A protein has these predicted regions:
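C-terminal motif of bacterial Sec signal peptides marking the signal peptidase cleavage site
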Residues: 13-16
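Short, glycine-/small- and polar/acidic-enriched structural segments
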Residues: 20-147, 152-155, 171-177, 190-194, ...
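Bacterial N-terminal signal peptides that target proteins for export
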Residues: 1-6
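Pocket-lining segment of extracytoplasmic ligand-binding domains
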Residues: 79-80, 154, 159-230
Length: 230
């Protein structure tokens, strides 16, 4: 009898630890612009709000998770959202919140002798294979009056970029400003950032309307602003 009771209690405890199957699954990666969502999670507000934060190491993982039906919502840039909708006709995406506008948080770092954008000709540049990475690279090329054929472009997720730069596999890298100190310790200099592209890089909270109803969308916005005011 004691053994049966113990097993029953263990089963109840395990069931209690299972994620809510009805919770909205929001995909994100650790980026400063998404901090209110992480704060809400740390404060224990997400579960009571019917939200489950699903963290990925890179934006590429978030996009893959959304395409594969593992997410109902995500923190993305505007261009990534448009590319996601274009690549997945079964999604019915809606942007419910603009979370921030980049003003220096996305940047291009390079080592000497690269000091200007024009100096990038013939250099190896690392960039994450996302819509944001492609967009930022295209704007760099515009500003430098170069073409893609003038560079050697290597696809690198953010978490591999510092190591690649330190190993001298790349000469320049498009990345988040948060990677700056680690890159600068390896001799990199910031030569271009999103301050030169005002209003062009926008982070948003996007949902799939098939799985997130209007009431839940309002709750998501309220959760964000509650955390922002904390």
């Amino acid at each position: 009898m004691f053994r049966c009771t113990t097993v029953l209690l263990l089963l109840i405890a395990l069931l209690g630890c299972q994620p809510d199957p009805e919770a909205i699954r929001i995909g994100s990666n650790r980026w400063l612009g998404y901090a209110p969502l992480y704060l809400a999670d740390d404060l224990g507000w997400t579960a009571p709000s019917g939200v489950r934060l699903v963290e990925y190491p890179t934006t590429t993982g978030v996009l893959r998770g959304f395409r594969n039906g593992m997410l109902d919502a995500a923190m993305l840039t505007l261009d990534e959202t448009l590319a996601l909708q274009d690549s997945a006709a079964d999604l019915d995406l809606e942007i419910i919140l603009i979370t921030n506008v980049s003003a220096g948080a996305d940047a291009l770092f390079a080592r000497a002798p690269v000091a200007t954008l024009a100096d990038l000709r013939g250099q190896r540049i690392g960039v994450e294979n996302t819509a944001l990475g492609a967009y930022f690279l295209s704007r760099v090329l515009d500003q430098a009056q170069l073409t893609i054929d003038d560079l050697q472009v290597l696809s690198l997720p953010v978490h591999e970029q510092v190591e690649a730069f330190a190993a001298k596999r790349i000469d320049a890298v498009i990345t988040f400003a948060s990677e700056g100190p680690a890159l600068e310790s390896q001799g990199a200099r910031r030569i271009f950032d999103s301050r030169q592209l005002p209003g062009e890089i926008i982070d948003v909270l996007v949902v799939d309307r098939q799985w997130v109803n209007p009431k839940q969308r309002r709750q998501l916005r309220a959760l964000w602003f509650d955390a922002l005011r904390t």
